[in-house]
Regions:
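Short amphipathic alpha-helix that is part of the acyltransferase structural core
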Residues: 1-22
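A conserved beta-strand-loop-helix scaffold within acyl/acetyltransferase catalytic domains
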Residues: 21-25, 34, 38-40, 45-65, ...
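Conserved acetyl-CoA-binding loop-helix of GNAT-fold acetyltransferases
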Residues: 69-72, 78-93, 114-119
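Conserved beta-strand-loop-alpha-helix junction that forms the acyl-donor binding cleft
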Residues: 77, 103-113, 130-135
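Conserved GNAT acetyl-CoA-binding A-motif
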Residues: 93-105
Length: 135
């Protein structure tokens, strides 16, 4: 996926959730990440080809895989698409037989996120308070 398309989708999904990590990355670093082998990206599209959401996995520490980003654009939320996208993406990742697939979340995540993660098989491993990055 081209950087401009990725960032447009990242912004559309992530703005309400205060996502900013990829926006802070230098362009060359993001280009390398998008072109590299360690990033697996699953994009949900409607029949016209418009991106409705995505799952992004970091396989750089395989056999552990981290779910780095997951979400839907606001107009696609509440229609059951999130659980379907996550389940489909996880099926793809489990095919490579990782030891585990994990994620971390925070209080800025979508209110339904934790229940979606739990229904997909994720369980709480650790909870901690961390200082927030200044805006």
């Amino acid at each position: 996926m081209a950087r401009s398309a990725y960032l447009a989708l990242y912004r559309h999904v992530g703005a309400p959730l205060r996502w900013d990590q990829r926006l802070k990355m230098p362009a060359t670093e993001l280009d390398a990440l998008l072109a590299g082998e360690s990033l697996h990206l699953y994009v949900l599209r409607d029949v016209s080809g418009e991106a409705l959401g995505f799952c992004e996995f970091d396989r750089g520490a395989f056999p552990q895989i981290e779910l780095k980003n997951f979400g839907l654009v606001p107009q696609a939320q509440g229609r059951g698409l999130g659980p379907w996208l996550l389940a489909t993406a996880l099926q793809g990742e489990w095919r490579s037989n990782p030891d585990r697939i994990w994620l971390h979340t925070d209080e800025w995540d979508h209110p339904a996120a934790r229940s979606v993660y739990e229904r997909a098989g994720f369980r709480v491993f650790d909870e901690r308070d961390e200082p927030a990055d200044p805006l």
